[in-house]
Amino acid sequence: MRNQTKMMLVACLMAVSTPMAALAAAQDYAFEAIKAEVRNGPGGDIAVRLVHKPSGKPVEGAVIFRTRLDMSPENMEGMTTKVEPLTESEPGVYKFRADFTMAGGWALKLQAKVQGEPETVQGAVVFTAKD
């Protein structure tokens, strides 16, 4: 009977500890552009996919709490524009609307919380605004 109790205790400990070991780290996630080119001008829609890199699967339900869109790819980090979040259109795809005021490279910098991940997931995606 004692062996059976010990085995049950070990099984319970394994079941409780396995999810903790399975947690990914913030660097196991990446934001990717759905389409890297966008129309220069007002009301440009952009979309990014949040991916869990080890599995390659999209991550849905992330809470994106900070965004910044600037022209840092063109060495003009001070040139920014407002970013308006839109609704999640498909699992793991996050859409935004912005006014692209100049043709060239724009970096969308994001910070997000992913369920079960204690660290903040951060990333940047480069878009090219074309006339």
Regions found by a protein language model. Give the residues of each.
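Contiguous segments within soluble domain cores/interaction surfaces
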Residues: A24-A103, A107-D131
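Bacterial N-terminal signal peptides that target proteins for export
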Residues: M1-L9
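Bacterial N-terminal signal peptides
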Residues: L9-P19
